[in-house]
């Protein structure tokens, strides 16, 4: 409990120092729905080509889904700042998630020779201000 509280106290300070030193900080939370997590878990159990992905944490994550979700929401409320915002990425569709994150980064950095029109971002896939939009996140 002490370590958690200390982490939550120190994280905003560290992020502020990074940003003040000129680092462009992107914080992405890759979110998967409970249903998709269960489907992937079953696939890892049954598909010999995916069994290498199995981890003991998979079953625990499903069992403690509500606890982990509440901890995630609390983290967003305590660590989502204008100088270091969180972005939630819906990852049930892995390809769409990856393309949208790449597009989000491209649109967010100052790179004049980049054609930003090819980097469209779907706001249903990349969600900004998650601490203010907890109702839109996977439960």
Roles of regions detected by a PLM:
Residues 14:
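Phosphate-binding/switch loop-helix module in NTP-utilizing enzymes
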Residues 1-10, 18-70, 116-124, 133:
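A glycine- and Lys/Arg-enriched "phosphate-lid" helix/loop adjacent to the NTP-binding pocket
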Residues 70-139:
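NTP-dependent small-molecule kinase module
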């Amino acid at each position: 409990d002490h370590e958690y509280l200390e982490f939550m106290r120190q994280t905003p300070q560290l992020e502020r120092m990074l940003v003040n030193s000129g680092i462009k900080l992107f914080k992405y939370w890759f979110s998967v729905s409970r249903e998709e997590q269960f489907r992937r878990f079953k696939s890892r159990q049954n598909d010999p080509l995916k069994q290498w992905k199995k981890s003991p944490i998979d079953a625990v994550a499903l069992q403690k889904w509500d606890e982990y979700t509440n901890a995630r929401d609390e983290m967003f409320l305590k660590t989502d700042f204008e100088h270091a915002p969180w972005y939630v990425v819906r990852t049930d569709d892995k390809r769409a998630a990856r393309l949208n994150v790449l597009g989000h980064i491209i649109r967010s950095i100052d790179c004049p020779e980049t054609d930003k029109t090819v980097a469209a971002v779907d706001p249903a896939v990349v969600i900004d201000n998650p601490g203010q939009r907890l109702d839109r996140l996977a439960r």
